[in-house]
């Protein structure tokens, strides 16, 4: 089984790198504000029709454009969900959502979290799924990519005040990256057997003679951007373990590739735009090392079997509880790490049924900020915060002013970096504490003891870091949990984007200094180790006490 696991990981990473490399070159064109071949005429017509100019924006204007678009999307989606029963494409006559669930869902999809306190097939109409959630899947992904575009430009430009035009970036990202790739993936899913229709739910007779109601809907089109945009919200409650969403082993492999495709391509693009491809490879090496170790730990933990079943004398050579037999332990373990290393949150197995250590690793990957490949855009700008922190620490050790890519990292940048890094840990720890201190929070726990606390900690970690996956033993559809998690999702998203954009605004105004004999190389194995150590150190110091009360205590009990 060890050989199978190694082959699975190696094949996945090899295919990923092959696909991401050319996409990274295309993204580099867009970052450099160069239209892709054959798109100039279309862009001219669209920009003219929409009133979009090529006038560049400073960081505040760029940020306001991103925030304005997202706030408008939040309001539209909120009222759409409230009035769902008045809108078309609702063959099941599903009612509108309660205000707290509508708020939670709207915030969830606008922030690229896709936390779901509802069951899609019994709660949302086709119109809400398509015009509401799927649209936000595109816009939230484009927003994250636009932010990293601005940050990369800040490193490559000198003595300037502008970072590009947010509207141009958003349109280009959506039209030339997200829509075409998602279309290809959706067509492949349809060919493999995923649903794509507007039929009412179908009553069928089973082999045993019972009657069953099969949900229908435009699944494949939402499934494609759900993965490509690292959104993660399933059309059905079972998410990607449902055969109508993920019908074959091949679609499952493509889904995992789609999750990491753009985050990996952005690393290649970063190297091209900065003029030093080693910088992009350095980031990929750091991410890949952490990723492979985490996959190995989860696979090892899950093939050991369930200790609780073993204690009862049951046969549990491997832990198959909560897993699809058509995928198995190794694929389920790989998918769990992929979906939590990125900000996706889609699942093919119930993370709540993983072993204590097997469930702790996905939780920890979210808690460190989902910087191991991470979400589209958000993963790379999150990792860049750790790069700046690592450069600062190295500068202190050698007694020189820290610099990265020729830009000096001063007090302002470090204050903003520290602020951005501290946002999500503060939300996670305070949110979990609030939930455990209140009756409304504790009443949602279906399990006592360390595992019950793990469910709470996982939920808040998932929301604050915009992942969206869950330990499903938590009954989160209540006003308390819907409001708490909506707050965590909102602040966890925009509370990081704001300081990141401020950092970009500060860096773009600086001149690049030529490298000297005292400059720390940031492209070699030494810096890779320093960066990994910084990520691990911050994650360990912040969350070890909380993890000790949850999964660690469960493992030792």
Curated annotation (Swiss-Prot):
Role summary: Part of the high-affinity ATP-driven potassium transport (or Kdp) system, which catalyzes the hydrolysis of ATP coupled with the electrogenic transport of potassium into the cytoplasm. This subunit binds the periplasmic potassium ions and delivers the ions to the membrane domain of KdpB through an intramembrane tunnel.
HAMAP family listed in its UniProt record: KdpA (MF_00275)
PANTHER family named among the record's database cross-references: POTASSIUM-TRANSPORTING ATPASE A CHAIN, POTASSIUM-TRANSPORTING ATPASE POTASSIUM-BINDING SUBUNIT
One Gene Ontology CC term in the entry: plasma membrane
Subunit structure: The system is composed of three essential subunits: KdpA, KdpB and KdpC.
Topology of this chain in the membrane: Multi-pass membrane protein
Keyword set, alphabetical order: Cell inner membrane, Cell membrane, Ion transport, Membrane, Potassium, Potassium transport, Transmembrane, Transmembrane helix, Transport
Highest taxon listed in the record's lineage: Bacteria
Lineage, broadest ranks: Bacteria, Pseudomonadati, Pseudomonadota, Gammaproteobacteria, Enterobacterales
Pfam family, one: KdpA
InterPro entries reported for this sequence: KdpA
Cellular compartment(s): Cell inner membrane
Residues passing through the membrane, by range: 5-25, 63-83, 132-152, 170-190, 253-273, 283-303, 329-349, 356-376, 379-399, 416-436, 484-504, 526-546
GO terms assigned for molecular function: P-type potassium transmembrane transporter activity; potassium ion binding
Family membership: Belongs to the KdpA family.
Protein name as annotated: Potassium-transporting ATPase potassium-binding subunit
């Amino acid at each position: 089984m060890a050989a199978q696991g190694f082959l699975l990981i190696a094949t996945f990473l090899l295919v990923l790198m092959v696909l991401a490399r050319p996409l990274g070159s295309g993204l580099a064109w867009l970052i450099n504000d160069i239209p892709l071949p054959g798109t100039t005429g279309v862009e001219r017509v669209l920009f003219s029709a929409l009133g979009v100019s090529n006038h560049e924006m400073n960081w505040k204007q760029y940020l306001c454009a991103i925030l304005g678009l997202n706030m408008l999307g939040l309001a539209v989606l909120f009222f759409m969900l409230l009035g769902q029963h008045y809108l078309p494409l609702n063959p099941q006559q599903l009612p509108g959502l309660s205000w707290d669930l509508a708020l939670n869902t709207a915030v969830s999809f606008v922030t690229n979290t896709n936390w779901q306190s509802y069951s899609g097939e019994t709660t949302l109409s086709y119109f809400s799924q398509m015009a509401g959630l799927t649209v936000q899947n595109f816009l939230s992904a484009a927003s994250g990519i636009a932010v990293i575009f601005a940050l990369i430009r800040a490193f490559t430009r000198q003595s300037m005040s502008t970072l590009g035009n947010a509207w141009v970036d958003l349109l280009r990202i959506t039209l030339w990256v997200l829509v075409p790739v998602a279309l290809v993936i959706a067509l492949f899913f349809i060919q493999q057997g995923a649903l794509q229709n507007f039929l009412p739910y179908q009553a069928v007779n089973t082999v045993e003679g019972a009657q069953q109601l099969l949900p229908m809907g435009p699944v494949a089109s939402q499934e494609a951007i759900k993965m490509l945009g690292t959104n993660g919200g399933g059309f059905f409650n079972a998410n990607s373990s449902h055969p109508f969403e993920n019908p074959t082993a091949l679609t499952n492999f493509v889904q995992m590739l789609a999750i990491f495709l753009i985050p990996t391509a952005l690393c290649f693009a970063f190297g091209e735009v900065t003029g030093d491809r080693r910088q992009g490879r350095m980031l990929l090496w750091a991410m890949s090392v952490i990723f492979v170790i985490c996959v190995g730990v989860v696979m090892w933990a899950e093939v050991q079997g369930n200790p609780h079943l073993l204690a009862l004398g049951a046969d549990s050579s491997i832990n198959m509880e909560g897993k699809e037999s058509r995928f198995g332990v190794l694929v389920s373990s790989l998918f769990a790490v992929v979906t939590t290393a990125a900000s996706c949150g889609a699942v093919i197995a119930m993370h709540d049924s993983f072993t204590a250590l097997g469930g702790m690793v996905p939780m920890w990957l979210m808690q460190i900020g989902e910087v191991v490949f991470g979400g589209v855009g958000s993963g790379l700008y999150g990792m860049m915060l750790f790069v700046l922190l690592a450069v600062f620490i190295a500068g202190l050790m050698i007694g020189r002013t820290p610099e990265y890519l020729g830009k000096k990292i001063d007090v302002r940048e470090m204050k903003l970096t520290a602020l951005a890094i501290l946002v999500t840990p503060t939300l996670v720890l305070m949110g979990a504490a609030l939930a455990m201190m209140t009756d409304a929070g504790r009443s949602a726990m279906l399990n006592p003891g360390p595992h019950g606390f793990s469910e709470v900690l996982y939920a808040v970690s998932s929301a604050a870091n915009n992942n969206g996956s869950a330990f499903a033993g938590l009954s989160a559809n209540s006003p308390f949990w819907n409001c708490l998690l909506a707050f965590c999702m909102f602040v966890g998203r925009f509370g990081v984007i704001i300081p990141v954009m401020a950092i970009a605004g500060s860096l773009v105004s600086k001149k690049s200094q030529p490298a000297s004999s005292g400059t720390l190389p940031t492209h070699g194995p030494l810096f890779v180790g320093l960066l990994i150590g910084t990520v691990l150190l911050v994650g360990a110091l912040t969350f070890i006490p909380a993890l000790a009360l949850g999964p660690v205590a469960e493992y030792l009990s």
